[in-house]
Amino acid sequence: GNNTPRYRLNSNLGASWKGFDIRALFEGTMKRDLWLGTGSTGIFWGYYGQWWSTLNDTHLDYWTPENPNAYYPTPTNTTRSRQTQTKYLQDASYIRLKDVTIGYNLPQAWISKFGIAQLRIFASGQNLWEATGLYKYLDPDATGNRKKDGEMEDRMTKYPFCRTYSFGINVTF
């Protein structure tokens, strides 16, 4: 796998019509792989490779005689089943609607009598949508290991971007 994205995507789209305007910013990466090794993330394998330290709903899909096609191996107190293999190579490509703003400029006839040159009302949202093939509890912007003093440093435990909504008024006198 290759943790360096082969392609980066950014698109800033905008349109306006009869006082209304909309702007949307998309960003993402394509062709990026991510190996979640034994010590790389507590969310995927459990902290320090111990599955019981962070049990979540996906960890319940482990091998048993009744579930031979499970995603995870049988939970054990060893790392033997969690060796490097393509089964656990994650697709870290994504596309995200990073920002969208919708606004309306009130007509001059309505606002000029109040000494206002321009009045714009808007609503904005950040991180409203994302599509990724990555494991569901990981944020593609916060993933990837890097070397720190010769050792791999965990970057999987960072908080993901928050979804934010804003409303406002711009007034020009």
What do the predicted segments below correspond to?
Residues Q50, L60, P65-N67, R82, ...:
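C-terminal beta-signal and terminal closure region of outer-membrane beta-barrel proteins
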Residues Y7-L9, K18-F20, S93, G115-L119, ...:
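Outer-envelope beta-barrel architecture signal
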Residues A24, I121-A123, I169:
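Membrane-embedded beta-strand positions of outer-membrane beta-barrel proteins
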Residues N10-N12, D99-G103, S166-G168:
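Membrane-embedded beta-strand positions in outer-membrane beta-barrel channels/transporters
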Residues S16, E27-T29, S124-L128, T172:
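Outer-membrane beta-barrel pore domains and translocons
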Residues N3-R6, K87-R96, Y159-C162:
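Short sequence motifs at beta-strands and strand-loop junctions characteristic
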